[in-house]
Amino acid sequence: TIYGNKNDRLKIDFSVERASFPEAQTMDPRIIRIAPLSYNERHKHAHESLFFVIEGEGEVLVGESWNPLSPGSLAFVPRWIMHQTHNTHPEMDLRILAITDFGFTSAVLGNYDKRTRMALGGVDAG
């Protein structure tokens, strides 16, 4: 796991793992797992993300709009746009392949990711 958080009060329960593509230099594919009826944190970052839903049901907030998610659906998150994902299924994890350009963006900007995420337990990291 490269990142995760759990906060019962905010209904946050998720983890992020790096998908294995050893030759990838600028793309950084990740598997996001969100527990049933839970969220990941509302956050933003410098890298772009393309979400492909592997399994489960939910919705993703991109800016001001909630968009439905189901297996096979795609969602795009532009740079520096506030976003959050919600698993709406009562029993099944929501699993998403997130393809990002984090490798390229972090090479240009340095390690900016920790400044834009919520600390464990729900306190802002930055």
Protein language model regions, located:
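Glycine-centered loop/turn positions within well-structured domains
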Residues: 48, 67, 83
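Short beta-strand His + acidic residue motifs that chelate non-heme Fe in jelly-roll/DSBH
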Residues: 40-42, 60-61, 77, 83-90
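A short hydrophobic beta-strand segment most commonly corresponding to one strand
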Residues: 76, 91-110
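Short, conserved beta-strand element in jelly-roll/cupin
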Residues: 31-35, 44-62, 99-102
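Conserved short histidine dyad/triad with adjacent acidic residue
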Residues: 13-17, 28-44, 79
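Short acidic-glycine-tyrosine-enriched beta hairpin
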Residues: 64-80
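A short, N-terminal "cap"/entry segment at the start of jelly-roll beta-barrel domains
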Residues: 1-26, 111-126
